[in-house]
Amino acid sequence: MEDTDRYDLRVNGGRLQESLEKVANIGATPAGGVQRLALSDEDTRARDLLVSWLEQLELEVTVDAMGNIFGRRAGCEDDLAPVMSGSHLDSQPRGGRFDGALGVLGMLEVMRTLRDHEVETRRPVVIVDWTNEEGSRFSPAMVASGVWAGALDLRWAYDRSDIDGVKLGAELERIGYRGDAPCQSFPVHAYYEYHIEQGPRLEREGKVIGAPQGIVCLQWYDVYLKGEANQVGPTPMEGRHDALCAAAEMILEVEALPREMGGDLVATVGEIQNQPNSRNIIPGEVHFTVDIRSWEDDLARRAWGVLERELLALAERRGCSVEIEETWSVARSSFDPKLVQRVLETADALDHPSLKMVSGAGHDASYVNQVCPSAMIFVPSIGGRSHVEVEQTRWQDCEAGANVLLH
């Protein structure tokens, strides 16, 4: 195509919606969300459907040792490094139907549009579905893109277990997605990840397209408290070593941390287990998680230092022992400025109001960015809601983002 009409091409918005709805039917929940935990039977069905669509497009389909699915469309100069885009099909428990899936199926629609209009690209174009982005079944998140980028070890990843002790590597084998191709990076000219914002800013400011300049740092910790279980009736309040009460105080310290430290810091306790979890037994053991995020790596580290000291002091005061593990840490990712600007300029050319911003959520682009120039394309989340069943994005915004990706 000539430069003068390069922006005339458009994706088929109705077809994109149809694809999203078909995938959303896999693992659909009663309240309108989805539950497709990584490597579950539901995730497998979504993968199978994606592969069938890629094969219909006559793409070169490859599955690597971490179950990442790649579909490659040849370019006129096929030895050049490809442009790659994608996201993930796994979900949170009772999660939303747009998170991740929009990025995979948005790129699928781009591939279909290129075929429909017989567009020949100079470079090859690759679509990818990353395994276990969410980390809700196998912790940590983004583990497969991390292995692909060389940041995480393959054997270590295979050894990650879910709550029932099932290992990630065994599940890959069970569902037939432990591929023969090595899970390692290959030359990529540019990577674009299309995603819902998962926050309120675009909607609040009346923008259709977001162009993140990067992704905040993410730090995950696991806190294990051990007190003394006992019968609730005969045991006096004085002298109890209640692990759950200690955890409750600690959780309030986590909530107070951002107010104390300032900046853009956020801190969350999202998971907790109480043992023996009986109404007439004083809790003896508690495990909970801490998630700390900030655009400033140093602020997040300093915040953890402050919090850790407080947690240790609280445990001692409550007569409980405590063990703390740092289970995952990813530094701030700053995207390629030229690619970020390209997203903004393309949105402007398509008459979509846009905004340069920061991503507060983690994405596979964080690891891919360590290997090749990367950027993301955001569209608004209605009410800023995500990782929940009521997660929604307007269909016209889904189409708008896919058109930015196309160009």
Predicted regions mapped to residue ranges:
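Catalytic-core environment of secreted peptidases
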Residues: 57, 69-102, 107, 231
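Midchain, well-structured core segments that form catalytic/ion-binding scaffolds
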Residues: 133, 137-298
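A short beta-alpha structural unit
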Residues: 36-38, 268-277, 289-295, 321-340, ...
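A generic, well-ordered mixed alpha/beta core segment in the N-terminal half of proteins
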Residues: 93-164
